[in-house]
């Protein structure tokens, strides 16, 4: 408990859904909504109508595009695995560099939405993701 209201918190994820290799689709926003409903925590869904002046009556659940111009005291950024370009292969380097930089810019945009607290959750580490390696190195310098 850090003295935050629910409206001070955003849970952000790259995309609302992800298609798995086995063909199934995970609806990440639905999973978050269900988890918060189960423990009676109020939330709002980030959309085009959400502005910095809007009254936030609960935790904001949003993909990264809808919080672009907003600020929260606390941001939880999860499911970085949904970003496609975790590493750059030497063979596919030309087109992957632009995509990699685009994903890095998305991460930068999200982490700058937090004014006091930032939590990043991921199953990746510095060895499995260049994006995570860059984040860890920037924190440690």
Predicted regions and their residues:
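Core RecA-like ATPase module of SF1/SF2 helicases and allied nucleic-acid translocases
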Residues: 1-119, 124-141
